[in-house]
Amino acid sequence: MPRFSKSVRVPYSTTQAFDLVSDVARYPEFIKWITALRVSDHRVDETGVRHCRGDAVVGFKGFVERFSTTVTADVSEGAVIASLIKGPFRHLKAEWAIMPLERGGCDIALQINYEFRNVLIAMLAAANHDIAVDRIMSAFLSEAHKRYGSSPSASVPG
């Protein structure tokens, strides 16, 4: 099963990073290939973890697919996880981890595990998954800069 991951160090607070990553409804505003997204079934469990359903339409290189995920956002763990409900995948799980840094800022890690049902789409995805994860992370970093500008902790050590 294909798996890819990317981690970046950013000057933003864990709260800012978590708010951005968990703001699923706004993904179409800054991730180009998400052409539509409906978020529903919002609830907060007894531990304060937020849950919702996301129904997305994704277009890439002439292919258009629809899929649904359950999204779990746990601020205390700095984790946002999207798990497949239905769609063109046999398996899909995207996990964001946001970890504070001692001197300010945070590390943001994204890991995606997936397997497409359609062999042609699987081959297209395999040829482009490194590009895709880089573009996803770049889209989030660009959106963070738009929303939060340069943070006081912009000189986060690498």
Where on the chain are the PLM-derived regions?
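Hydrophobic ligand-binding cavity/cleft-lining segments
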Residues: 1-49, 103, 150, 158
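Amphipathic alpha-helical interaction elements
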Residues: 9, 19-22, 72, 125, ...
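Beta-strand elements of well-folded, non-transmembrane domains
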Residues: 10-14, 56-62, 73-77, 88-90, ...
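Hydrophobic pocket/interface hotspot
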Residues: 17-21, 27, 54, 71, ...
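Glycine-rich portal/gate segments that line the openings of hydrophobic small-molecule binding cavities
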Residues: 39-85, 139-146, 155
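Beta-strand/loop substructures that line and gate deep hydrophobic ligand-binding cavities in soluble
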Residues: 81-135
